[in-house]
Design a protein with these regions (language model features):
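Periplasmic/cell-envelope proteins involved in peptidoglycan metabolism and beta-lactam response
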Residues: 1-255, 345-357, 473-477, 502-552
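Beta-lactam-recognizing serine transpeptidase/beta-lactamase-like catalytic domain environment
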Residues: 57, 179-192, 231, 235-276, ...
Length: 552
């Protein structure tokens, strides 16, 4: 018996030595694996601001309420009712969440911190919290189509939020903690690995100009009972987009009833036949060739022109017009006669060089190339109609970029949504400086009383631009629904801004671009020039405006 007792004692000592010394590290690791946990520490998503630092998107701290279902089911009835009430859900909904056999379940995401504190004070079994963030958009529907929004998991789903997801995201940190068997944190063990917050994205957008464009476009869409609309403001020196608005829009802070029509960034995604806003490009090609001058006379009588079996007509018959007057009075016949003086290749290359048929490459979702037919399939009638904006499709952003070539003395350049401290890249020359300036003079004529858009004039400033009025196509056929547009630039002597406006399906009488889109351009351009501190350059209009204020 003594020997047996001594043997047992020796075995116990040996086992203890093995456990305490030889296998200590292994056992300690197994033990720690049961109560040590690495917890991810969320990084804050980067802010999005306008060019002046005003907030467009910011992350606010919130809480996720989660549960270990098996433990949470031990809550009393009153505890469950209290938790459900704090989370603004029914007791039945809460019961269904914790009825699962899973070991983890989200009870509710993005709970306000003050609510989470009240829940924590209840010390409910199996109910836990983690920090997360919720995206907030201070400017709401005004900037929704540019900024976009994130989902509940803080990932970008639209706009800049999606396009710059990796830069905005940041990197989470971590900390090692001790939890009890119920999942409660007892203490921190390892020092915090700090999270790296996402980068701030500063847009080229100017919130004041954005608000101006939004309010004026909204008023016009409501006045004309239109289906939709869009407006863009571009700084021609840098290619920066100072404003981009669409209607209808939506509130990114409350997307419960968001529809596809509200979500569409129409200025980038919607294409349409532009109509007469294309005519200045045809005139520029003719001037650039040296075949005509602004004062060259074109016979537009009797206001009709037959090509094959098709007849092209002017809205109002004209007789003899100079090239400048063809643009000013928006003659289809005169424009077609200019266009048919060139082989299809030359006209196609010009349209391609100013960006038609190409995506604008802003880096945001939804950009389209629109439609510029391959030159190999151009017939005379196709070339004729494209010269005045039919048989070709464009987006509003393409028109804004294309008109920048006249503002930049014949050079085209890229557009950008992001503010850059670097000098803008050199442009690509499309037209000579002389041609660009001659077209600007014609565009200024178009807003005079004898032109098609006197309502687009801006008191105190010399401006120029072109109207567009085009039928819409539905089911492969033209219907009596209109797209009214106006694209212009100012100050005309040294343009700083291009403003493009489109109103989709105006009703109630007026539908011409000069009547519907022209006044919107006037308000947006005038307000933008004043916001940027650009001095008036038309003393005659300044005097007229001052005299008008003194009348009874």
């Amino acid at each position: 018996v003594g020997l047996l007792l001594m043997g047992a004692f020796a075995a116990l000592v040996g086992r203890g030595f093995y456990l305490q010394v030889i296998n200590n590290d292994f056992l300690q690791g197994k033990c720690e694996s049961r109560y040590l946990r690495d917890i991810e520490v969320s990084a804050s998503r980067g802010k999005i601001t306008d060019r002046n630092g005003d907030l467009l998107a910011v992350s606010t701290p919130m809480k996720t309420i989660w549960a270990i279902p098996g433990d949470a089911r031990t809550m009393s009835g009153p505890q469950k009712q209290r938790l459900a009430a704090l989370l603004d859900m029914s007791a039945r909904e809460l019961e269904s969440k914790i009825a699962t056999e899973k070991t983890f379940v989200f009870v509710k995401r993005q709970v306000p911190p003050e609510t989470a504190e009240r829940i924590a004070a209840l010390k409910l079994p199996g109910v836990h919290q983690e920090k997360e963030y919720r995206r907030y958009y201070p400017t709401g529907d005004m900037t929704a189509h540019i900024v976009g929004f994130t989902g509940v998991d803080d990932k970008g789903l639209e706009g800049v939020e999606l396009a710059f997801q990796q830069s905005l995201l940041g990197r989470p940190g971590s900390r090692t903690v001790i939890r009890d068997r119920r999942g409660n944190i007892i203490e921190d063990v390892v020092a915090l690995k700090p999270p790296q917050d996402g980068k701030e994205i500063r847009l080229a957008l100017d919130s004041k100009i954005q608000y101006l464009a939004y309010s004026q476009l909204k008023a016009a869409v409501e006045k004309h009972n239109a289906k939709a609309g869009g407006a863009i403001v571009v700084d021609t020196r840098t290619g920066e987009i100072l404003a981009l608005v669409n209607l209808p829009t939506y509130n990114p802070n409350n997307r419960d009833r968001l529809s596809g029509a509200q979500l569409r960034n129409r200025a980038l995604t919607d294409t349409f036949e532009p109509g007469s806003v294309m005519k200045p490009f045809t005139a520029a090609l003719a001037l650039e060739s040296g075949k005509v001058r602004p004062e060259t006379v074109i016979n537009c009588a009797p206001g009709r022109l037959t090509i094959g079996s098709a007849t092209i007509s002017d809205a109002h018959p004209h007789g003899a017009l100079t090239v400048a007057q063809v643009v000013q009075k928006s003659s289809n016949v005169g424009t077609v006669k200019l266009a048919l003086g060139f082989p299809p290749r030359e006209m196609w290359e010009m349209l391609d060089s100013v960006g038609f048929g190409q995506a604008p490459k802003l880096g945001v979702p939804g950009e389209v190339t629109a439609r510029l037919r391959p030159r190999e399939i151009w017939r005379p009638i196709a070339q004729a109609t494209m010269s005045y904006g039919h048989g070709v499709s464009v987006s509003l952003i393409q028109l804004a970029r294309a008109y920048s070539v006249f503002a930049r003395d014949g050079e085209t350049g890229p557009l950008t949504l992001i503010r850059s401290e670097e000098p803008p890249p050199h442009g690509v020359r499309v037209f000579s400086q002389q041609t660009a300036r001659e077209i600007r003079a014609m565009l200024e004529m178009a807003v005079q009383p004898e032109g098609t858009a006197p309502k687009a004039r801006v008191p105190g400033y010399r401006v120029g631009g072109k109207t567009g009025t085009a039928y819409k196509i539905e089911g492969g056929a033209y219907v009596r629904k209109y797209i009214a547009s106006f694209i212009g630039l100012a100050p005309i002597g040294d343009p700083r801004l291009v403003v493009a406006v489109m109103i989709d399906e105006p009703t109630g009488g007026a539908h011409y671009g000069g009547d519907v889109a022209g006044p919107v351009f006037s308000q947006i351009m005038g307000g933008s020039l004043r916001t940027l501190g650009i001095p008036p350059d038309d003393p005659i209009q300044v005097a007229e405006a001052a005299a008008g204020k003194g009348r009874l």
